[in-house]
């Protein structure tokens, strides 16, 4: 792989998935409220960003996993799986009743649970957790379960 592309992918921060998680539902909302054009722009942009992030995971896997050793990054990482769940709603609008949409949604749920397990195993259980060690972003990891029922129409 080209070093320039690999360096570009390494530079993409994991928390960018939070931006994707905001863009996709906003696009779906705008579309449902009659603003199809701008809604689709948000959704397609989010889809493009998540595809680029998937490339980051594939081609810089070791670096991505190393970043998860940071408790703040690890607690924000589940926004990726939440964004995947919302992307499956957008894809269901584009390609109704396709098995790939359900497969993506279920895969995102499994990955979300895996990231939760990883976060608990690496950042909570091995250390004595004090209030100074807890960051507000930790709640993202566990509140993300709420995205499952909100996207379950897929």
Task: Report residues per predicted region.
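Hydrophobic, membrane-facing alpha-helical anchors
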Residues: 1-5, 48-65, 111-126
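Juxtamembrane helix-loop boundaries in multi-pass membrane proteins
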Residues: 2-27, 62-89, 105-108, 124-150
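Membrane helical hairpin/interfacial module
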Residues: 31-102
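Sequence-level detector for tyrosine residue identity
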Residues: 44, 118, 133-135
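A generic, well-ordered mixed alpha/beta core segment in the N-terminal half of proteins
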Residues: 89-124
């Amino acid at each position: 792989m080209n070093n320039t592309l690999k360096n570009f992918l390494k530079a993409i921060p994991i928390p960018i998935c939070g931006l994707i998680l905001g863009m996709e539902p906003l696009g779906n909302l705008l579309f449902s409220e009659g603003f199809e054009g701008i809604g689709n722009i948000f959704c397609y942009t989010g889809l493009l960003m998540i595809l680029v992030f998937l490339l980051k995971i594939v081609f810089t896997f070791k670096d991505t996993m190393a970043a998860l050793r940071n408790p703040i990054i690890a607690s924000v990482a589940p926004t990726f799986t939440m964004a995947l769940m919302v992307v499956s709603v957008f894809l269901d609008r584009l390609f109704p009743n396709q098995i790939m949409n359900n497969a993506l949604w279920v895969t995102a749920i499994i990955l979300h649970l895996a990231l939760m397990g990883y976060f608990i195993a690496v950042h909570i259980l091995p250390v004595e957790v004090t209030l100074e060690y807890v960051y507000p972003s930790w709640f993202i990891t566990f509140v993300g379960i709420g995205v499952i029922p909100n996207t379950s129409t897929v």
